[in-house]
């Protein structure tokens, strides 16, 4: 049983972790104007510059794909990523951005799975998210379809879903089904509230965090990331050697 019911631990702060130890930010919203992330090219450049100053060296950007709000496609994301990389060259910012997506768990996602029209991180890890309001009734058939296509299902920020705050058994079921977990670094700064912080700490203590992402949307998140980089639990996660980020 995962230890989320433990008494929430006091957040201990240290000097900022050098993000070069993480290496790769694999969840971000850097492409201008296609979701609720960066809105202008200047925004995109500011986000990349800020993350590089922390030490991140490489990026997988993952725009929302959500049929009701952000109807992005493989082509819009790939083209947007190319535009961003061209801007970085012109701005003499030495880094590379790679195209992925954050798929909302809806009927459109099921259609994309059926067509195998998907952008996975490194061609391997398929990032998806649930609704914050409604627990998915039965995600397991879709998870099995994802695996049958040769992808590894990767759930974005499980610490943020209220229906998991007091039901670690539900996360255990996902884990048993082969789902990887990605933690938002800002959760360790309490950015999403005390319950998300508690679950994030519990996930680290229970060694069930596979990836760390900034999920950055706007420049104000840079200040939050700066605080999160001082978290004792972040040090614990990085020092555990469990993170797959460096291999991306």
Language-model segments: residues:
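Short acidic/histidine-rich active-site segments
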Residues: 209-224
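Extended substrate/RNA-proximal surfaces in nucleic-acid metabolism proteins
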Residues: 12-13, 71-181
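Mobile, glycine- and charge-enriched loop segments
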Residues: 2, 13-33, 168-185, 189, ...
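Active-site beta-loop-alpha junctions enriched in small/polar residues
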Residues: 29-31, 64-65, 100-104, 131-133, ...
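An N-terminally biased module of ancient metal coordination in phosphate/nucleic-acid-related enzymes
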Residues: 1-92
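Mid-to-C-terminal alpha-helical segments outside catalytic/metal-binding sites
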Residues: 8, 226-248
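Non-catalytic positions within long, well-ordered alpha-helices that form the structural scaffold/packing
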Residues: 52, 147, 204-205
């Amino acid at each position: 049983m995962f230890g989320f019911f433990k008494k929430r631990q006091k957040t201990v702060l240290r000097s900022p972790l050098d993000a070069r130890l993480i290496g790769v930010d694999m969840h971000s919203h850097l492409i201008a104007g296609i979701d609720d992330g960066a809105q202008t090219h200047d925004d995109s450049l500011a986000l990349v510059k800020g993350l590089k100053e922390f030490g991140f060296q490489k990026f997988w950007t993952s725009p929302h794909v959500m049929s009701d709000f952000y109807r992005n496609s493989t082509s819009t994301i790939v083209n947007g990523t190319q535009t961003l990389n061209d801007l970085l060259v012109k701005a003499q910012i030495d880094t590379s951005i790679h195209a992925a997506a954050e798929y909302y768990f809806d009927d459109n996602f099921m259609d994309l799975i059926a067509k195998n029209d998907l952008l996975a991180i490194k061609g391997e890890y398929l990032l998806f998210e649930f609704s914050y309001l409604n627990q998915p009734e039965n995600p397991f058939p879709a998870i099995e379809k994802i695996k049958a296509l040769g992808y590894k299902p990767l759930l974005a920020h499980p610490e943020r879903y209220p229906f998991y705050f007091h039901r670690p058994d539900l996360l255990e079921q996902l884990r048993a089904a082969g789902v990887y977990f990605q933690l938002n670094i800002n959760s360790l700064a309490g950015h999403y509230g005390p319950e998300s912080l508690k679950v994030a700490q519990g996930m680290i203590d229970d060694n069930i965090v596979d990836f760390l992402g900034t999920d950055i949307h706007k420049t104000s998140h840079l200040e939050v990331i700066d605080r999160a980089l001082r978290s004792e639990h972040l040090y614990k996660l990085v020092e555990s050697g469990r993170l797959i980020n460096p291999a991306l």
